[in-house]
Amino acid sequence: MKSILNDFLLMIQFFTRIPVNKNLQCEKENFKRGAFFLPVVAFIIGGMEFLIYLGLKNFLPANVIIVLLILFTAMITGGLHMDGLADTCDGFFSLRDKERIIEIMKDSRIGSYGTIALIIDLLLKYQLLYSLVLKGYSIAIVLAPIIGRISILFLCLSKRTAKKNGSGNIFIGNMSKPIIFFITTIVLVLSTYFLGLRATIIPFIGVLLITYLLYLLCLNKINGLTGDTLGACNELGEITFLLILLMM
């Protein structure tokens, strides 16, 4: 029980800015087991967003609430995944060789492509969430972050790391397939309860497809994955899920 709590708190500490005032074991096995809780962390984030939405929907227009929710997400996650998307776009669109691309991705400064990617990411999230709320799919506020993290887990099934050292290496190739498939089944069952089978399966297939295409792009550009590409995967997974759901 103590190790389970350790791994859960480790995921909260690693993926959010929620203060965890506790010394935790941070071995590879802790992260491997802790992957089970990544969608749970996403559920906590999405759940808080949903509660904010419910608390404000009678006082503010939906479009204003969505802006506040996006701001809240950026604050509670430290913009971790958005930063990964920006770094990935800066590197991949630089049209340089592998070594130079990785150097660009490690640079803390944001470039033109990263800026454009963030603007598009935020605009799409805003418009998609706003449109889905108006359509009666406010539950997407909770589901999108969970599906995004699920896509990260699937990407981590690959053992191809682009760097010898990096924060992403503790996840890449270290995920348990049974755990990932078990978590995915639970998430899909819950999503089906709220959205129906068709509105769950088709968007999820789209997310898996985008995840695989990103994987192929990563192999082509840098011969593997990094922590930044995992963050990019989350953002692309969320947007793909929301976009296809809106089309249903």
From Swiss-Prot:
Cofactor requirements of the protein: Mg(2+)
Primary localization: membrane
Q: Any stretches that span the bilayer, and where are they?
A: 36-56, 59-79, 114-134, 137-157, 170-190, 199-219
What is the annotated localization of this protein? Cell membrane
Q: In which pathway does it act?
A: Cofactor biosynthesis; adenosylcobalamin biosynthesis; adenosylcobalamin from cob(II)yrinate a,c-diamide: step 7/7
Broadest EC class?
transferase
Q: Write the record's keywords in alphabetical order, separated by commas.
A: Cell membrane, Cobalamin biosynthesis, Magnesium, Membrane, Transferase, Transmembrane, Transmembrane helix
Calcium recorded as keyword: no
EC? 2.7.8.26
* One record GO biological process: cobalamin biosynthetic process
Write down the chemical reaction(s) this protein catalyses: alpha-ribazole + adenosylcob(III)inamide-GDP = adenosylcob(III)alamin + GMP + H(+); alpha-ribazole 5'-phosphate + adenosylcob(III)inamide-GDP = adenosylcob(III)alamin 5'-phosphate + GMP + H(+)
A Pfam family this protein belongs to? CobS
Membrane topology category: Multi-pass membrane protein
Q: Name one GO cellular component term.
A: plasma membrane
For this chain, one GO molecular function annotation is: cobalamin 5'-phosphate synthase activity
So what family is this one in? Answer: Belongs to the CobS family.
The function of this protein is: Joins adenosylcobinamide-GDP and alpha-ribazole to generate adenosylcobalamin (Ado-cobalamin). Also synthesizes adenosylcobalamin 5'-phosphate from adenosylcobinamide-GDP and alpha-ribazole 5'-phosphate.
What's the protein here called? Adenosylcobinamide-GDP ribazoletransferase
The gene name on file is cobS
